[in-house]
Amino acid sequence: MSLCDQCEIGCRRVGIKDIEDASAVNADFHFSAIFQPTDPHHHQTEFAKVEGSEKYVEEVEVFGRQALKVNPEALTILAHRAFSDVHHFFRKDHLEGWRRAIEDPEASDNDRYVATTLLKNACIAAGRVLPSCQDTGTAIVLGKRGELCWTGGEDEKYLSKGIWNAYRYHNLRYSQTAALDMFKECNTGDNLPAQLDLLAVPGSDYEFLFIAKGGGSANKAYLYQETKALLNPKSLRAFIEEKLKTLGTAACPPYHIALVIGGTSAEMTMKTVKLASCRYYDSLPTTGDKYGRAFRDPEWEKIVMEVAQKSGIGAQFGGKYFAHQARVIRLPRHGASCPVGLAVSCSADRQILAHINKSGIYIEQLEQNPAQYLPDIPEVHLSTTSVKVDLKRPIDKVRQQLSQYPVGTRVMLNGTLIVARDIAHAKIKEMMDNGEPLPEYMKTSPIYYAGPAKTPEGYASGSFGPTTAGRMDSYVDLFQSHGGSYITLAKGNRSKQVTDACKKHGGFYLGSIGGPAAILAKDSIKQVTCLAFPELGMEAVWKIEVEDFPAFIVVDDKGNDMYSKTLA
């Protein structure tokens, strides 16, 4: 008899009677949900009713129970509204964080300057013309539909239509790429597909969390496969001190930092850490139990904040305000595994709650008057002196001027910048690999790593903030060796290969403030012209004229890096 035959016979012998007998042994069965928030429906959140939305809902009786019949068009209306509001308004706790940084006597000048700029940017974005950030993100929807909520079953389609409307009819950027084969890609042209996670729950209401997640902060979500050895105060603190530095500044601090210890699987850990960064689990209990419930740990949240403040990284250019706040959540785990998740919500901090009930559609009330958070502090107390840099001169003259100042110096750029990011760099390298020279425009002006949102009528530019510098690190030495990219401008820290290349070739990396894309478009960018690869959309090469464009010298021509100590 084969092993397979033996297995089959064994399976036949296990009948319903055996299962019933086994179940009887578990007389003390106890079900306990892992997540037990005290405010699961976010009643502490202020919601505003969408005017006239009651016409999209109807109560019906089914088998003696009250069900909610929802016209699926309500999903389209809600998604459109959510992904419009979230690009122009912020939660109050986020705005309060910037205000604290401005008023804190322990904050650095750079902390206060960055926080003030971000608050001013919020004021411009609140005009509902320019989005707060040029990277208007991947659209993510978490939906929990009650078992007695009927929509017709095509929820993903109707939610996607609302997202499509938001990105089509507002000044938002299309960032999603479709894979044509393993290597060829194209922009989808509408920012779809969205990520839609829809769940069934008891009741008749339909609850939502809408998130617009940009690439910078999404790329700072980390999974670490640890062991029981991590679970003691000394080891955990050392782990936090090490890993917080790896977040760097590329995702635009001050951050909302989330740390999750444990998880029944890696994917559970990472989903929890993303939602924690959105403050979705704020009402979890603060103690665990023998059944494995999730809980927040306020003591370790304080420790994470202490480590963040003492790191010296600050709000991008040194200081205290690396983070607004922290969330630390402990989960159950398999005895052989200890997954740990680390993630952030960045300065764009775009998430918004909503729900549909028998009265209509309700959406979280974000703050529409951010100007009230700007303190009455003279500008002289908010920033250090800036150095004016005229970019209309030959690039060698600009390099000579920058060489006179130490890293950390704030500069104001005036003149021409060339804008090129990931795909443009890849195409230029491909041209060079095929024997073509480095384009002349890469040699005559600083290179700004960015990609604009759509330009509103009457504006010179759409929101146009920097993208993460690190993704272009591999090109710097090559391009500088061919006489180009001597001065680059973007956000975040860079690798040692960039520092080495700048020292070798006499180059500089200037750090732009990550986050205030609207204020740059309104106040600093005066003209935008497409130079090359127009078919790439926002990934094309652009020529822009700027006035008083703020930046900091991060890497100089002597091999100095302003982050060398804080991120070491």
UniProtKB/Swiss-Prot annotation:
GO biological process: fumarate metabolic process; malate metabolic process; tricarboxylic acid cycle
Record-linked Pfam families: Fumerase, Fumerase_C
Main location: cytoplasm
Regulation of this protein's activity per its record: Specifically and competitively inhibited by 2-thiomalate, which coordinates with the catalytic [4Fe-4S] cluster. Weakly inhibited by malonate.
Co-factor: note: Binds 1 [4Fe-4S] cluster per subunit.
Protein residues bound to (S)-malate 1: Q134, D135, R173, G216, R421, T467, T468, A469, G470, R471, K491
Cited Gene3D superfamilies: Fe-S hydro-lyase, tartrate dehydratase beta-type, catalytic domain
Taxonomic lineage from the root: Eukaryota, Discoba, Euglenozoa, Kinetoplastea, Metakinetoplastina
Cofactor names: [4Fe-4S] cluster
Name the record gives this protein: Fumarate hydratase 2
